[in-house]
Design a protein with these regions (language model features):
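N-terminal leader/linker segments that initiate helical-solenoid repeat arrays
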Residues: 20-59, 63
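Bacterial N-terminal signal peptides
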Residues: 9-18
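Conserved alpha-helical positions within TPR/SEL1-like repeat arrays
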Residues: 36-47, 70-81, 104-115, 138-148, ...
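Structural marker of alpha-solenoid helical repeat scaffolds
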Residues: 64, 98, 132, 166, ...
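Structural signature of tandem alpha-helical TPR/SEL1-like repeats
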Residues: 47-60, 82-94, 104, 115-128, ...
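Terminal, low-structured helical/coil segments at or just beyond the last alpha-helical repeat
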Residues: 20-34, 209, 213-250
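Boundary/linker segments of alpha-helical solenoid repeat arrays
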Residues: 103-104, 137-138, 171-172, 205-206, ...
Length: 250
């Protein structure tokens, strides 16, 4: 009888320990799922434009995992969409503190500084992003934009060319190259670049508009009218004064 009781107690203890271990694993699994669920809720909220809810969900993730770089990055983006510049910058810097090799954090910092008109700081951040990821197309493009704002046309052109060198079908890069050639008074090269942008993205409104202006300069008025009309259909507001100048050629 005592032997049976002894075995019963041992078995009961083993079952209890197994139950505890299983419970711990379940709790860990629930915690991991909960983080992903909060991420999904945050993503869905941001897609709907409900930024307050998105911020709240990312903050819940960070309470569970304070060093979750993805949550800090996404929270920064949400703050940026809310116009909360200081909080946005703070989150991107927190990402860099956690992992200094996340190129997107530097890129987003560059975007934030650029929007504030802090061009030198934006330039530095884009360069840091490119040091980590030399094939970061958008960083090359945005660095080109900074150089253009600083009236450094050759440097801007170089960055845009690097972007299309990485991704030949990058329509924005071809459009920006066309804009540089336009400013350099190289009309033929500008037109070729705008046309290439439209081959990739036929409804690129800005490229249609740019071609309309370029063809007007070349006195190819039918083509100017064609692209001006297409620009309007693609969602851009064409300068009424420009349309007035085209009227005699319709």
């Amino acid at each position: 009888m005592k032997t049976n009781l002894k075995y019963f107690c041992i078995i009961a203890l083993i079952l209890f320990l197994i139950s505890c271990a299983s419970g711990t694993k379940t709790e860990r699994k629930d915690k991991a799922l909960s983080i992903e669920e909060h991420f999904q809720l945050a993503f869905n909220a941001a897609e709907r434009g409900n930024l307050e809810e998105a911020v709240s969900e990312y903050q819940k993730v960070l309470k569970m995992d304070p060093k979750n770089s993805r949550a800090h990055l996404n929270l920064g983006i949400a703050y940026g969409r809310q116009g909360k510049w200081k909080q946005e910058i703070s989150e991107y810097k927190r990402v860099i503190d956690i992992d200094p090799n996340i190129a997107e954090a530097y890129f987003n910092l560059g975007v934030a500084y650029n929007e504030r008109g802090e061009l030198n700081e934006a330039l530095v951040q884009y360069q840091k992003a490119l040091k980590i990821n030399p094939n970061y197309i958008e960083a090359h493009n945005n660095l080109g934009v900074i150089y253009l704002k600083k009236e450094k046309l050759d440097e801007a052109l170089s960055e845009y060319q690097k972007a299309i060198g990485i991704k030949p079908d990058y329509a924005k890069g071809h459009y920006n190259i066309g804009s540089i050639f336009w400013q350099k008074k190289n009309l033929e090269e500008a037109i070729a670049s705008f046309q290439r942008a439209l081959e990739i993205h036929p409804n690129y409104a800005e490229a249609h508009y740019a071609l309309a202006v370029a063809y007007y300069e070349k006195q190819e008025f039918k083509l100017a009218i064609q692209h001006a009309d297409q620009a309007g259909k693609s969602g851009i507001i064409v300068d009424p004064k420009y349309l007035e100048r085209l009227k005699p050629y319709r």
